[in-house]
């Protein structure tokens, strides 16, 4: 059998049109109308040497929520939730960080944003499947990912190396651009997530400087145990990145990760973070702790704001689910699912069309950052 890639016409149409009006509720690559855990439309495309592509049914799977239904990632923040007593102080700090670092909040796409490769290791086929517009890569060969000491720690973390044994990395996968070179693999067959930080291939062998593995993700709250995971807080990319499918669908149904420039010292952080890379040697008062959650004031009329379509989608998610501080960066920023996740399957980079060709640093122009509200420390901790 000669397998060929059939790209969803629905998905391409959504990307071409900017994708913010919602997708078809049926068809081989329909984009789900909700982030709830529903059975997704799954198809596989294949052809013989002389025939037309034929759909091959596979087990229905939902990509919308890979962690426990009780995960903080998926729990809306009630409108009457208590606020942090330092909320207004933290909001002023956030505004100062934005103003003094380029005056904007960037949407990272190709750099400092992890690709997420969804794979199936028991697919029984070498055809790419499509689940609600997301490519699912069949992988028949597992590889061991080695450790390389990019931070000159002088030791090998053997427990981490053990977690990186037998990783189903699809052929042709690439990590993100930029110095962090992040990469995520999610195996739908086993509900296992791997993350890698500063990832590279040397003589055909994969290596990474840090990361981790989460098994049985449907039973996990969406937090790597200390000290694992590729973000500074141990919060996985797959929980808080924004996907092209979500923007095409017009709705984000989870909390969003946000990176700040400055944060409270490493020993002061909030659940759900399991650690922090904050650095405050001069003991500046009232720094925002990593792991803390914030939301856009739910009383703001988002539809009345002069926002881009994507900015409006993000603002509504910020009201309902909020942001969680998961990392530090050179500018305040959010992460999209890296377009390498789609390009491996033959799709173009979806973000220029979804952003209506607006630069990534201008997509959130007009966002009401002054209306952010910070939640109490350890908000929502079981």
Question: Language-model segments: which ranges?
Answer:
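Sec-dependent bacterial lipoprotein signal peptides
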Residues: 1-18
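Generic hydrophobic-segment detector
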Residues: 8-12, 26, 312
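Bacterial Sec-dependent N-terminal signal peptides
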Residues: 13-55
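Short, surface-exposed polybasic-aromatic patches that bind anionic ligands, especially phosphate groups
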Residues: 39-382
């Amino acid at each position: 059998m000669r397998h060929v890639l059939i790209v969803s016409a629905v998905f391409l149409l959504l990307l071409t049109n900017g994708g913010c009006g919602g997708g078809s509720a049926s068809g081989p690559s329909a984009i789900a109308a909700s982030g709830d855990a529903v059975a997704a439309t799954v198809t596989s495309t294949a052809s013989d040497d002389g025939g037309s592509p034929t759909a091959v049914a596979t087990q229905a799977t939902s990509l919308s929520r890979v962690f426990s239904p009780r995960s903080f990632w998926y729990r809306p923040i009630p409108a009457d939730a208590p606020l942090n007593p330092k909320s207004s102080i933290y909001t002023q700090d956030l505004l100062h960080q934005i103003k003094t670092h380029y005056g904007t909040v960037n949407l990272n796409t190709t750099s400092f944003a992890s690709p997420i490769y969804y794979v199936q290791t028991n697919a029984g086929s070498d055809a790419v499947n499509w689940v609600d517009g997301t490519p699912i890569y069949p992988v028949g060969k597992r590889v061991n990912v080695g450790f390389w000491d990019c931070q000159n720690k002088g030791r090998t973390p053997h427990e981490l190396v053990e977690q990186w044994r037998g990783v189903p990395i699809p052929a042709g996968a690439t990590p993100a651009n930029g110095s962090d070179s992040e990469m995520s693999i999610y195996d739908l067959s086993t509900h296992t997530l791997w993350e890698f930080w500063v990832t590279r291939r040397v003589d055909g062998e994969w290596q990474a400087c840090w990361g981790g593995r989460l098994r049985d993700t449907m039973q996990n709250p969406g937090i790597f145990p200390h000290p694992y995971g590729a973000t500074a807080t141990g919060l996985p990319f797959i929980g808080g990145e924004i996907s092209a499918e979500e923007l095409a669908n017009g709705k984000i149904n989870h909390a969003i990760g946000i990176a700040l420039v400055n944060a409270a010292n490493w020993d002061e952080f909030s659940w759900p973070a399991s650690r922090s890379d904050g650095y405050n040697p001069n003991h500046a008062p009232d720094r925002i702790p990593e792991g803390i959650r914030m939301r856009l004031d739910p009383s703001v009329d988002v539809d009345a704001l002069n926002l881009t379509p994507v900015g409006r989608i993000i603002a509504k998610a910020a009201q309902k689910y909020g942001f969680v501080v998961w990392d530090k960066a050179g500018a305040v920023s959010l992460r999209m699912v890296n377009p390498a996740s789609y390009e491996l399957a033959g799709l173009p980079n979806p973000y220029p069309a979804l952003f209506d060709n607006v630069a990534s640093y201008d997509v959130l122009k007009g966002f009401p950052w002054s209306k952010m509200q910070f939640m109490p420390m350890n908000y929502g901790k079981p």
